[in-house]
Amino acid sequence: MNLYGLVADIGGTNARLALCNLENGVIERIETYSAKQHAGLESIISHYLAEQKTVVTYACIAIACPINGDWVEMTNHQWAFSISELKRTLGLEKLDVINDFTAVSMAIPMLTEEYKLQLGGGEAVKDKPIAVYGAGTGLGVAHLIKVDKQWVSLPGEGGHVDFAANSEEQDAILAVLRRKFGHVSVERILSGSGLVNLYQAIAILDHRQPEDLEPETVTQRALDKSCQYCHRALTLFCEIMGRFGGNLALNMGTFGGVYIAGGIVPRFLDFFRQSNFLHGFEDKGRFKPLVQQIPVYLITHPQPGLLGSGTYLRQQLSLID
């Protein structure tokens, strides 16, 4: 067997590629490319392997979209491809293409304590269901369950469920966003663009003309308190992150923990920890005592998508006990 397998984490903005040591799962030689600068996935993979002067026969690619059959179309990018054709073109013996949050979920059993920050709740119960979600370009969601000796990821498109307003203020925001989008999914709020949507809706409700800001600008103005609408948007973002996470905890009784991934929250971690996130997570009425037992963590590993892709590949090759 070739010592290395190719692993990739393909998002709407960036494509991260690496080699996974199939014996021990260590992720090596990580490179990040702009998805906008390449015509397609085959181009990026070929470029990476040429740079590394490496030939691989096994690969696992995590990608930000539903995987239903051979044809794959990305949700937040124009790329589309055939899995079988990509496998043939790259000369691979095995190619697994999985949802990006399938990969993130598969990383969780491999995380050491240094790569997870507990935000609340009790102790995780061994081998119980796990939930993971994260805001970035979009909102990813997955669950993880233990079946016999293997972890099985249950991916889905949970970011596209209806946004559930929980106050009069949120009702008003929902009405503004409904006029703009029609269907308002929770991803319209819990994502980079969603943070901007929140800011703009809050400004409109105060009869002001919102600026066309980038998510990073909304965050910065919130943190330095130079814009009351940005500050309120980030405050609500944190609370709604908690409410959504608490919903996931209830859905499957995730006593193994609820994990937050994604690139947004670490940018304002101190603000997040002092926010109403945990209140939102636990505010489940009669079931508050139950949810308070469930631990909630922030994943601090720099590349959980690559780590999880490697774990998935090694498990498929029966290299993990």
UniProtKB/Swiss-Prot annotation:
Q: Which residues bind ATP?
A: 8-13
Top-level lineage group? Bacteria
**Predominant place of localization:** cytoplasm
Q: Where found?
A: Cytoplasm
Alphabetically, the GO molecular function entries are: ATP binding; D-glucose binding; glucokinase activity
Alphabetical GO CC annotations of the entry are:
cytosol
Reaction equation(s) it catalyzes: D-glucose + ATP = D-glucose 6-phosphate + ADP + H(+)
Give EC number(s), comma-separated: 2.7.1.2
Pfam families, per this entry? Glucokinase
**What InterPro entries is this protein classified in?**
ATPase_NBD, Bacterial_glucokinase, Glucokinase
* Top EC class, one word: transferase
GO biological process: any one?
Answer: glycolytic process
The similarity annotation says: Belongs to the bacterial glucokinase family.
Identify the NCBIfam families for this entry: glk, PRK00292.1-1, PRK00292.1-3, PRK12408.1
The protein's name is Glucokinase
Q: Which organism is it from?
A: Photorhabdus laumondii subsp. laumondii (strain DSM 15139 / CIP 105565 / TT01) (Photorhabdus luminescens subsp. laumondii)
Q: Which gene encodes it?
A: glk
